[in-house]
């Protein structure tokens, strides 16, 4: 990818591109997506953006308006709530049982829906819990959305990082007849370890893709030209990508298993992640004196043990903390040893 970026620079690829991205990259994204879905996808369905975050932001602004409610599985990535707020829509948290790693089902959706519900955001594998939805679980959720006429925004940025086989994409679940209300967002930041290159994309109906590109034309215009060429190289050399991902997954699995063992031996409650690279750790029971134990523990770990974690309140889960194991193995294991030694007060 770095060599591809050098070649692009040498060739003078420093000008604007189409707002939606260079045609070869969009075609490569469409071809990859088509392998996961019976119905064909082409470049006109794809908008390349400055990371998956921008793709989600574009979708929220293009689809939702003041008064619209969007269901958000909770605990969930903090930016979902903020993006919807900026778009003047209302984020409605939906939470499944702890025993199911908080995954939602038809029952939770039916309880949360109102006549103002217009959409649903899904994230599998999940940040922060690492939960992965099975095909049957996704089929149940899609059925509810189809019946209600909701849009589904499926954030699949962690799809390549799964410890229980291959994570199911909604592209392979949603029927082609209902694909018109499905937006997939993905990118290179996680499974290709390219967060700084700022390349993400959305896949959706052509009319929506045009609206999202029009919106993007007034914010950032095209994603960085050089990064687009690097991304094309990454998506084109599938053998090299699979080999690199397999090596990365071996290391991530070692970190996950080692860190999980240390924390559980220390008596901490930890959700076992099936995907992504986070451990969700229980920080204690919320009380009137300590309504956000995750915040208190995160501050204590940073101030007294030089360990940085994310307080669960960022994900609407104040009794938890999120521990990343994306850092070097030695740092991860030392960090979780300190967390285990600190315990829960």
Please give the residue ranges for each predicted region.
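N-terminal small-domain helix-loop-helix segment of the aminotransferase-like
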Residues: 1-51, 58, 108, 237, ...
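Conserved PLP-anchoring active-site segment centered on the Schiff-base-forming lysine
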Residues: 62-84
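A short helix-loop-beta submotif of the ANL/AMP-binding
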Residues: 86-91
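Active-site phosphate-binding strand-loop segment of PLP-dependent enzymes
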Residues: 92, 96-171
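Conserved glycine-rich beta-strand-loop-beta hairpin in the small C-terminal domain of fold type I
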Residues: 232, 246-260, 270-284, 319
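PLP-dependent enzyme catalytic core of the Aspartate aminotransferase-like
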Residues: 290-309, 313-345
């Amino acid at each position: 990818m770095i060599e591809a970026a050098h070649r692009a620079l040498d060739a003078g690829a420093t000008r604007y591109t189409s707002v939606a991205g260079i045609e070869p990259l969009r075609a490569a994204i469409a071809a990859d997506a088509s392998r996961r879905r019976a119905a064909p996808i082409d470049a006109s369905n794809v908008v390349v953006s400055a990371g998956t975050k921008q793709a989600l932001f574009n979708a929220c602004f293009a689809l939702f308006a003041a008064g619209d409610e969007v269901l958000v599985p909770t605990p969930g990535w903090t930016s979902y709530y903020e993006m919807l707020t900026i778009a003047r829509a209302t984020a409605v948290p939906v939470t499944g049982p702890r025993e199911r790693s908080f995954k939602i089902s038809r029952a939770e959706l039916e309880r949360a829906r109102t006549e103002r519900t217009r959409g649903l955001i899904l994230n599998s594998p999940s940040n922060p819990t690492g939960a992965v939805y099975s095909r049957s679980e996704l089929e149940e959720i899609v059925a509810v959305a189809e019946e209600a006429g909701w849009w589904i925004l499926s954030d699949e940025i962690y799809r390549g990082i799964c410890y229980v086989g291959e994570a199911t994409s909604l592209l392979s679940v949603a029927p082609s007849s209902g694909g018109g209300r499905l937006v997939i967002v993905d990118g290179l930041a996680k499974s290709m370890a390219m967060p700084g290159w700022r390349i993400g994309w959305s896949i959706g109906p052509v009319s929506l893709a045009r609206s999202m590109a029009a919106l993007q034309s007034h914010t950032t215009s095209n994603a960085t030209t050089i990064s687009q060429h690097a991304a094309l190289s990454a998506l084109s050399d599938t053998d090299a990508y699979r080999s690199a991902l397999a090596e990365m997954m071996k290391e991530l699995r070692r970190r996950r298993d080692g860190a999980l063992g240390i924390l559980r031996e220390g008596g901490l409650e930890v959700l076992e992640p099936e995907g992504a690279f986070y451990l969700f750790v229980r920080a204690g029971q919320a009380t009137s004196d300590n309504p956000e134990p995750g915040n208190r523990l995160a501050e204590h770990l940073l101030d007294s043990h030089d360990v940085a974690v994310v307080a669960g309140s960022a994900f609407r889960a104040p009794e938890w903390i999120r521990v990343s194991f994306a850092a070097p193995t030695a740092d991860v294991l030392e960090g979780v040893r300190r967390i285990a030694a600190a315990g829960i007060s």
